[in-house]
């Protein structure tokens, strides 16, 4: 089936989803979760085939880890669907309302986008997360995953479609594009009028391609070159702990710190313990000459290092002589995802927050907190680094648009 034909089916399903009640959608989410657990063996068999092909094809260990499923991971994915069912339904929520002077009742209410396209890499969990959050928000979804996860995604979507249909909603609410070729992505990007919004999740090259070539409106999710700035007024022990957590708690996420900026006034106190802690965690430091004075293990940092989202056990480190210099560095190299300051100075914190342009700004906290679950939003589809339509963690409300409902009693203009 062509992408256009699948998009047309999704559009038909979206019309039914738009008027589905919360109880029906939540029942479908629970059915999806139960089916995943019940059919775990066939899911793992498909995943095993993908893993074998990936090893033979030379996929690196990090990609294989993201691709891999086991009984525990499938159970966790199912639990995430149950948690989505417990979240409030955004559809029909009144964003604002008033009675106009002429007596008209005006309400702005949330409505689904309609059809959401998701383009993503080798993460089978995204297949289920995206299907769940789109269904809960009343949207049909077209999924285009990586060819390296083709069998896993096919098995997962088959399970989800059966569960959705069994709960009384259209199976075409959840579809996996039949083709995993680059042409299928191009067709999806050109399906304006059938697909309402396209969300890319993955590396910089994937996101750039979709943003630059799509005629369907795109919500850009986050490449993250996140910084931690250790201010002159920082508590050194707190700063070391935050920097270490931001870099090492999980290496391959978009909210992982990739660069560390240190005010010259605290370099002597901060850098020796920080570099030792990073080295003990297996992190390679790429630093400026000032940083290299504190450790022979520091590699020279290039301009490319400061611009790189490593997603690995590497970090760039630079000494700066002022908050101004830190902000200038972030403006040059940051991606607008998450930036952090460690300081005991409220004026410095306020200035940093005001001047840094990012989806999230942390004060005395790890960059790793930029996450829908950590923010208390529940499920998220990604972290938007653009300013339209959404910014930051994208939960259920961010997968909606609004319309105005005006109720009168015969008023004429």
Swiss-Prot record:
Instruction: Report the GO molecular function annotations.
Output: glutamate-5-semialdehyde dehydrogenase activity; NADP binding
* InterPro entries reported in the protein's UniProt record: Ald_DH/histidinol_DH, Ald_DH_C, Ald_DH_N, Aldehyde_DH_dom, G-glutamylP_reductase_CS, Glu-5-SA_DH, GPR_dom
Q: Name one Pfam family in it.
A: Aldedh
Describe which pathway this protein belongs to, using the record's wording. Amino-acid biosynthesis; L-proline biosynthesis; L-glutamate 5-semialdehyde from L-glutamate: step 2/2
First-tier enzyme category under EC: oxidoreductase
SUPFAM superfamilies, alphabetized: ALDH-like
The name of this protein is Gamma-glutamyl phosphate reductase
Q: Which PROSITE patterns match?
A: PROA
Q: Which UniProt keywords apply?
A: Amino-acid biosynthesis, Cytoplasm, NADP, Oxidoreductase, Proline biosynthesis
Lineage start: Bacteria, Bacillati, Actinomycetota, Actinomycetes, Micromonosporales
Give the E.C. number(s).
Answer: 1.2.1.41
- GO biological process, alphabetically ordered: L-proline biosynthetic process
Subcellular compartments:
Cytoplasm
- Give the record's family classification: Belongs to the gamma-glutamyl phosphate reductase family.
One Gene Ontology CC term in the entry: cytoplasm
């Amino acid at each position: 089936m062509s992408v256009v034909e699948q998009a047309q089916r999704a559009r038909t399903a979206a019309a039914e989803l738009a008027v589905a009640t919360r109880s029906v959608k939540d029942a479908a989410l629970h059915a999806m979760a139960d089916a995943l657990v019940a059919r775990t063996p066939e899911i793992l068999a498909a995943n095993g085939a993908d893993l074998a092909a990936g090893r033979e094809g030379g996929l690196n260990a990090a990609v294989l880890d993201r691709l891999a499923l086991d009984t525990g991971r499938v159970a966790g994915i199912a639990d995430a669907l149950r948690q989505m069912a417990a979240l409030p339904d955004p559809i029909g929520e009144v964003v604002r309302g008033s009675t106009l002077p002429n007596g008209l009742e005006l309400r702005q209410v949330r409505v689904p986008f309609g059809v959401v396209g998701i383009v993503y890499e080798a993460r089978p969990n995204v297949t289920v997360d995206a299907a769940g959050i789109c269904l809960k928000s009343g949207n049909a979804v077209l999924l285009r995953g990586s060819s390296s996860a083709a069998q896993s995604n096919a098995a997962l979507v088959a399970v989800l479609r059966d569960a959705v249909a069994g709960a009384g909603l259209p199976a075409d609410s959840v579809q996996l594009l039949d083709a995993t070729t680059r042409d299928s992505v191009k067709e999806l990007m050109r399906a304006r009028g059938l697909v309402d919004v396209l969300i890319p999740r993955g590396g910089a090259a994937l996101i750039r391609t979709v943003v630059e070539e799509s005629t369907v409106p795109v919500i850009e999710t986050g490449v993250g070159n996140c910084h931690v700035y250790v201010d002159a007024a920082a508590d050194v022990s707190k700063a070391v702990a935050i920097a270490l957590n931001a870099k090492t708690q999980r290496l391959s996420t978009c909210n992982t710190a990739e660069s560390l900026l240190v005010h010259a006034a605290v370099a002597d106190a901060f850098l020796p313990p920080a570099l030792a802690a990073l080295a003990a965690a297996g992190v390679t430091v790429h630093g400026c000459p000032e940083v290299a004075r504190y450790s022979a293990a520091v590699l020279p940092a290039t301009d490319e290092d400061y611009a790189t989202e490593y997603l690995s056990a590497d970090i760039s480190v630079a000494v700066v002589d002022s908050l101004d210099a830190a902000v200038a560095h972030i403006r040059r190299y940051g991606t607008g995802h998450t930036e952090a300051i460690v300081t005991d100075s409220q004026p410095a914190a306020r200035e940093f927050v005001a001047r840094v342009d990012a989806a999230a700004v942390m004060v005395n906290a790890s960059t790793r907190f930029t996450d829908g679950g950590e923010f208390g939003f529940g499920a998220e589809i990604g972290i938007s680094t653009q300013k339209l339509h959404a910014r930051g963690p994208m939960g259920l409300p961010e997968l909606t648009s609004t319309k105005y409902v005006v109720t009168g009693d015969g008023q004429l203009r």
